């Protein structure tokens, strides 16, 4: 492994016990599959995952932060693949009531999926394991999680700011 990084971000938007999923076609890094809205960081976004996510959200579905409520950063995952370290930053939000979502997307097909069907969709390994944790645990708490991907899944730990106690 050469120490190359690939920084990516995604947002999963919910409304009425459904999650907005994108059937992404033509990705450079994954086969056609279901995922959140998102993509790669631009060079000027390397220290700002939220800005990268908001740019991708606008480019792909025409939404901005004002269309969302309860926007939270929930997960960062690491995975070694194809000689690089892939860092994924995952956000979650609710779509504000009366927000109009365009039906077309230049990256693939959008679909509102019932919560109980989300995990039945074919999706990238890391996204699926993260969503399994989110659906069983993460959506019920205010924690932020870090995860390291293994062939068996993702090992999650809560990210805690302990700088007040230590130098």
How should each PLM-predicted stretch be described?
Residues 64-74:
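A short coil-to-beta-strand element that immediately follows conserved catalytic motifs
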Residues 18-58, 145, 149-167:
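Conserved Nudix-box catalytic region and its N-terminal flanking loop in Nudix hydrolases
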Residues 1-21, 41-42:
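Conserved N-terminal beta-strand and adjoining loop/helix that marks the start
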Residues 102-133, 157-163:
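NUDIX/MutT-family hydrolases
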Residues 17, 77-100, 129-138:
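Active-site-adjacent beta-strand/loop module that shapes the phosphate/pyrophosphate-binding cleft
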């Amino acid at each position: 492994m050469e120490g190359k990084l690939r920084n990516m971000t995604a947002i999963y938007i919910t409304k009425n016990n459904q999650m907005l999923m994108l059937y992404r076609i033509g990705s450079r890094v994954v086969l056609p599959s279901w995922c959140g809205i998102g993509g790669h960081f631009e060079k000027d976004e390397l220290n700002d995952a939220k800005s990268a996510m908001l740019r991708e959200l606008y480019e792909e579905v025409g939404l901005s932060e004002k269309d969302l409520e309860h926007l939270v950063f929930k997960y960062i995952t690491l995975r070694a693949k194809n000689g690089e370290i892939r860092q994924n930053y995952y956000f979650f939000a609710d779509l504000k009531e009366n927000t109009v979502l365009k039906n077309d997307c230049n990256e693939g097909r959008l679909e509102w999926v019932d919560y109980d069907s989300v995990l039945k969709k074919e999706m990238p390994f890391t996204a699926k394991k993260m969503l399994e944790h989110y659906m069983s645990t993460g959506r019920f708490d205010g924690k932020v999680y870090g995860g390291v991907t293994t062939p068996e899944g993702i090992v999650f730990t809560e990210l805690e700011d302990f700088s007040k106690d230590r130098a």
